[in-house]
């Protein structure tokens, strides 16, 4: 009798693009983050809209206003959508918009396992379909940890559940379907200096309903 494999037990493919923005953009992003350090606010969790600050689930700092860099970032992120859909064998994404945020993870910061799709917004005109995470940081790197852990949806018959850890390498862009369970592993930043944080630009490709 043939053995069947439950697809939910397997890891979903992701795409990893090294040297995505280049050193000049990395420096521009670092300059933005450091200059706007006082404007970062605690991250929240929740089903879109106004979330709740829950440091036992998510501990990090967030900036949504990317100023004059936003348009250039959107152009760069949008340029890889079609190739990513083909490489990951996803259904076509009718791009409605890009949702961007800049997140800083410092000493002890993390984000527990979650998915990026929302289910309780029937009035929304679009949904998160593809998640992108772009990493940058100061050199030499001032933190350890902070890996992106991608999980299989379900455990295998023996109770084990597959996962893979992706290091937050500077100038690397990671893409995966927004419904994939994932987490940010805890960060160690001995100096505690904001400039030594693990910085990430989260980009959600929103598909029109």
What are the language-model segments listed below?
Residues 88-100, 144:
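A short coil-to-beta-strand element that immediately follows conserved catalytic motifs
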Residues 98-111:
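A short glycine-rich, His/Asp/Glu-containing loop-to-beta-strand
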């Amino acid at each position: 009798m043939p053995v069947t494999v439950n697809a939910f037990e397997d890891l979903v493919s992701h795409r990893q693009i090294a040297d995505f923005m280049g050193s000049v953009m990395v420096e521009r992003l670092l300059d933005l983050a450091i200059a706007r350090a006082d404007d970062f606010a605690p991250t929240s969790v929740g089903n879109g809209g106004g979330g709740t600050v829950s440091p036992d689930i998510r501990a990090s700092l967030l900036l949504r206003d990317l100023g004059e860099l936003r348009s250039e970032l959107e152009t760069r992120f949008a340029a890889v959508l079609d190739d990513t859909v083909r490489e990951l064998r996803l259904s076509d994404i009718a791009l409605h918009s890009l949702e961007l945020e800049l997140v800083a993870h410092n000493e002890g910061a993390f984000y527990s396992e979650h998915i990026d799709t929302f289910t309780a917004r029937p009035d929304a005109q679009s949904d998160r379909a593809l998640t992108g995470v772009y990493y940058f940081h100061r050199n030499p790197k001032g933190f350890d940890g902070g890996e992106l852990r991608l999980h299989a949806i379900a455990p295998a018959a023996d109770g084990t559940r597959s996962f893979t850890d992706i290091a937050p390498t500077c100038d690397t862009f990671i893409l995966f379907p927004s419904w994939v369970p994932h987490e940010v592993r805890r960060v160690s930043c001995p100096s505690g200096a904001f400039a030594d944080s693990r910085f990430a630009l989260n980009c959600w490709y929103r598909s029109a309903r």
